[in-house]
Regions:
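Predominantly a core beta-strand signature of beta-propeller blades
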Residues: 27, 75-78, 123-125, 256-261, ...
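Serine-hydrolase catalytic core recognition
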Residues: 326, 431-771
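Conserved beta-propeller blade repeats
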Residues: 33-48, 83-101, 124-125, 130-148, ...
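Short loop/turn segments that connect beta-strands within beta-propeller blades
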Residues: 70-74, 119-123, 249-253, 304-308, ...
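Beta-strand-rich domains and repeat architectures in extracellular enzymes and scaffolds
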Residues: 28-64, 238-242
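Predominantly five- to eight-bladed beta-propeller fold
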Residues: 63-64, 152-253, 284, 294-301, ...
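Short, solvent-exposed loop/turn segments at conserved positions within beta-propeller repeat blades
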Residues: 58-64, 106-113, 236-241, 291-298, ...
Length: 771
């Protein structure tokens, strides 16, 4: 017995030692994160190809490459491609090739992506398009002979490219001639040099001539549309709409193929789907020059795979996305939201429509009060090449697989085509991301994230059984970290409405102690927190903060009414939901009421500004990509509110409503030291309508404030910005809270940093005379 006790003591000591060796997560661990995206299962169901995303060596961007793993598990994933920017892998119907897109780098920046093919029998991949604007979204024809894709090239681009190639060929020949040896070796060196010089001069002259003849391209823009730029994409180019192209699938690098443009016109096209017999291609478009004056609608077209005029099949009075062809080729499934009544938020549903002229679509999930095709979000989805989902038909056409959001979780489910009834395929506190099935429907592969795991790949038998984990992308790193599971709580708001929230506590949390609190508010406003990895929250907790992240009214995953209840009242009662959550934690006894912080991004930035204008209880705030003035935002955002979704009228017709709901209106009430995090190319919430206003007003009022600006960063800074910028963002947020909640010295946020403090009054320095 004594020996057993001694043995158990040794084991306990070993476990304790292993635990002690773990460290807290840091902001810079992001540099070592690995993301898994866009899984594609082989036709025979034996393997999955996926995109592996990592931070590049300079920590200024991301590398993406294709990897493969068997669906049966038991093997480590292995790398298929070695490009820095490979993505969108798509298996050929016979499983012998993978088409994908690759963007090569020039001068440190990715060029337009081109279509490439990887032979699965062995050998290197090869590119087979060379289009000025690149190519994307490859789709194999059913017979595997042709690939459809989208591109925004126009005839002018192609003509310029051809002209440039001809010039380069002329220069190449001239340079080759100039470097050739003298044909008369018997001549003296001086004479030989004189003989070669005219050729060299000719080459230089050709270069200068080409430069002189290069057409000047104006860089001004004449804008006639209300929507003229998009966040993360920049200013829109009406001369380059996205169209449908096809190209013969080459079998090797020596086979030269010529892409063919199938559609044309001034409107974008997408959602490409091949007909079952490969004779036609279906796609969606909207032939309206200024769609913001109307409610959303989607037009479905068909074009012959050999080319010709497109035929409009249907006009759907909703915004349809993610088309999927039924096994018999007679129906399309898609996701879409109704447009009437005009809501602030309308849940997407799963629809089916016959491929017959003007057929009426059927809402499969009309009575299913959840968000189809969406769920919870975090800060660590793959920052590049994540891919997307489409509803997947069962082989017999009797069911469809899709994800939905429910109370902080994202669930994969099967929906009965006849009844709309749902059967959950995944369970537990997690968020399903991307999913695919094998051709026979027997195997489902999908990505999953949890509160302590960045997405990994899993395989699940469609007829039931336990999921099998195929990748362990971050296990080596995470095994070294003290990550804590958040506590799910619920509380009643002022009107009795139940609010769900999560509490991220520090490692080795002690309920007898008092901790500073950070209230973290999500954006959207129609979005949801939940069981998904949040690097930001884990790091805040590791730094000694308790983090509260609630889903106030207006959040998704709680039904249509809960999501839309804030229409024309945002901000409003959602603020009360947030304060009720803070009160709930304070009642639990482990929060220091004098050390309350608040932060949030986008809609969360708006609410952060709102909070500090409504209550002085917070000792520090960080508003990120925020809104200060609804009126200024109405005029400058990258999308319009011409429809009465968030406001009943424009600001010049209802100034009082815009003013009443704008945080800047209440700036005179603010006492909280506040930082503003801004992306300089954020077109979703432009800095001039948000943080710049708040910062200037607080400076006038002599309230401590700082503005942190991130060059070349859009609204997506926190999720897909440059890695260094993402890390610096976290450092500044926590740094500000450290200063005001922890009492840390942060001279970088002082008007006069310590090394530039003016001399004391009793010093020998004197004020220089006026000159």
């Amino acid at each position: 017995m004594r020996k057993l006790t001694f043995f158990l003591s040794i084991c306990a000591a070993a476990v304790g030692s292993a635990s002690a060796q773990k460290r807290n997560i840091t902001e810079k661990d992001l540099f070592d994160f690995v993301w898994v995206g866009d899984p594609q299962i082989s036709p025979d169901g034996s393997r999955v190809v996926f995109v592996r995303v990592t931070v590049n060596e300079k920590k200024e961007g991301y590398n993406t490459s294709l990897w493969s793993v068997p669906t049966a598990g038991g093997e480590e994933p292995h790398q298929l491609t070695k490009g820095d920017h490979d993505g969108q892998p798509r298996w050929s119907p016979d499983g012998k090739f993978i088409a994908f897109v690759r963007a090569n780098e020039k001068d440190g920046k990715p060029e337009p992506p081109q279509l490439s093919i990887l032979p699965m029998s062995g050998g290197d991949s090869f590119a087979f398009t060379d289009l000025p604007k690149g190519a994307a979204d490859p789709k194999w024809s059913p017979d595997g002979k042709t690939i459809a894709f989208t591109s925004s090239n126009n005839p002018e681009d192609l003509a310029k490219q051809e002209k440039k190639k001809q010039k380069e060929e002329e220069l190449k020949k001239a340079v080759t001639a100039s470097s050739s040896p003298s044909p008369s070796p018997s001549k003296s060196g001086a004479t030989a040099k004189a003989t070669a010089d005219p050729v060299k001069i000719t080459a230089e002259a050709l270069v200068k001539k080409a430069e002189a003849e290069a057409e000047h391209e104006s860089d001004i823009q004449v804008i006639t549309h209300a929507v003229y730029r998009e966040d993360n994409d920049g200013y829109l180019d009406a001369k380059h709409p996205q169209h449908i192209w096809t190209v013969t699938a080459p079998k090797n690098a020596d086979e030269k193929v010529q892409p063919k443009q199938l559609t044309s016109g001034r409107f974008d096209e997408g959602n490409v789907v091949w007909s079952k017999d490969g004779a036609r291609i279906y796609y969606t478009s909207r032939h309206t020059d200024e769609p913001y004056y109307e409610l959303a609608k989607t037009e479905i077209y068909a074009v012959a795979a050999t080319g010709g005029e497109s035929t409009k099949i249907n006009t759907l009075e909703l915004d349809a996305q993610d088309l999927s062809l039924s096994p018999d080729g007679k129906q399309l499934a898609f996701l879409g939201a109704v447009t009437q009544p005009v809501n602030s938020y309308t849940q997407p549903d799963l629809w089916i429509v016959d491929l017959a002229p003007n057929a009426k679509p059927r809402n499969l999930t009309e009575k299913f009060d959840s968000d189809l095709g969406a769920g919870v979000f975090g800060d660590n989805a793959p920052p590049r090449a994540d891919g997307g989902n489409v509803p997947i038909w069962s082989q017999d056409g009797k069911s469809l697989i899709e994800i939905y959001g429910k109370e902080g979780r994202t669930i994969l489910a099967s929906f009965d085509v006849a009844t709309g009834n749902a059967t959950d395929l995944t369970h537990g506190n997690q968020a399903v991301g991307r999913f695919r099935t094998s051709a026979d429907g027997s195997t489902i592969v999908y990505t999953v994230s949890t509160a302590t795991r960045i997405s990994d790949l899993f395989a699940l038998p469609a007829n039931g059984g336990e999921p099998k984990q195929l990748t362990n992308s971050n296990d080596k790193l995470f095994s070294q970290l003290n990550l804590t599971e958040p506590e799910e709580i619920s509380y009643q708001s002022f009107d009795g409405k139940k609010i769900q929230a999560w509490v991220q506590k520090p490692p080795n949390f002690d309920a007898a102690k008092k901790y500073p609190l950070i209230l973290n508010i999500h954006g959207g406003p129609h979005a949801a927190y939940g069981y998904i990895f949040e690097h930001e929250f884990q790091w805040m907790a590791a730094k000694g903060y308790v983090v509260l992240y609630p889903n106030p009214r207006g959040s998704t995953t709680y039904g249509q009414d809960f999501g839309n209840v804030i229409q024309y009242h945002y901000p409003g009662d959602d603020f009360k939901d947030l304060m009720a959550g803070v009160d709930e934690l304070i009642k639990r006894g482990y929060i220091d009421n004098n050390k309350l912080g608040v932060t949030g991004g986008s809609g969360g930035g708006l609410l952060t500004n709102w909070v500090i204008g409504q209550t002085p209880r917070f000792a520090a705030a960080v508003a990120q990509r925020d809104i200060a003035s609804w009126s200024d935002w109405w005029y400058s955002a990258d999308f319009t509110l011409f429809q009465a979704s968030w406001f009943k009228a424009p600001p010049f017709e209802d100034e009082a409503d815009f003013k009443a709901r704008s945080p800047i209106t209440y700036i005179k009430n603010v006492k909280t030291p506040t930082m503003f995090i801004l992306g300089e190319v954020d077109y979703r919430t432009p800095p001039g309508a948000g943080g710049e206003q708040m910062f200037r007003a607080l400076k006038f009022r002599k309230i401590p404030t700082a503005m942190v600006r991130f060059p070349n960063e859009s609204h997506e800074l926190s999720r897909s910005g440059q890695p260094w910028h993402r890390v610096e963002r976290l450092q500044h947020i926590v740094g500000w809270f450290d200063k005001w909640l922890m009492g840390a010295a942060k001279p970088e946020y002082d008007v006069a940093p310590q090394d530039e403090v003016p001399a004391k009054k009793d010093s020998a320095a004197k004020t220089p005379p006026n000159e």
